């Protein structure tokens, strides 16, 4: 029997996942962080990106979060996400369109463009596309 910890992924709308996992990998403020049972207590900001969870038995699921907080306690990991979805439920066409729109806004030389907003939109779109691509690889 493998060593596990409890994970809750919750968005403002509803609970996305609640169950026992062997490992959680998320994109924190300083990069990817891997959490296994027995990890030291931690509180960090999440950046838009994927959350990979390894269930008992080694099966992996991929979720997309659009920022939020990750808390690690001795026997529980909690992700409070601004927005969270299973990666397979993401709309690839919409993500590609959002990426193209953000890139066009950044490339334009107009004075009425808020570059920080465009950069954040670009980061979200790229994170969604990566999550979709990893889900595709997992399904093959």
Curated annotation (Swiss-Prot):
Disulfide bonds: none
SUPFAM superfamilies reported in the protein's UniProt record: Epsilon subunit of F1F0-ATP synthase C-terminal domain, Epsilon subunit of F1F0-ATP synthase N-terminal domain
GO cellular component, one term: proton-transporting ATP synthase complex
InterPro entries reported in the protein's UniProt record: ATP_F1_dsu/esu_C_sf, ATP_synth_F1_dsu/esu, ATP_synth_F1_dsu/esu_N, ATP_synth_F1_esu_C, ATPsynth_dsu/esu_N
MF-aspect GO terms: ATP binding; proton-transporting ATP synthase activity, rotational mechanism
Sequence intervals crossing the membrane: none
One Pfam short name: ATP-synt_DE
Annotated membrane topology: Peripheral membrane protein
Family indicated by similarity: Belongs to the ATPase epsilon chain family.
Function field: Produces ATP from ADP in the presence of a proton gradient across the membrane.
Protein name as annotated: ATP synthase epsilon chain
Organism: Legionella pneumophila subsp. pneumophila (strain Philadelphia 1 / ATCC 33152 / DSM 7513)
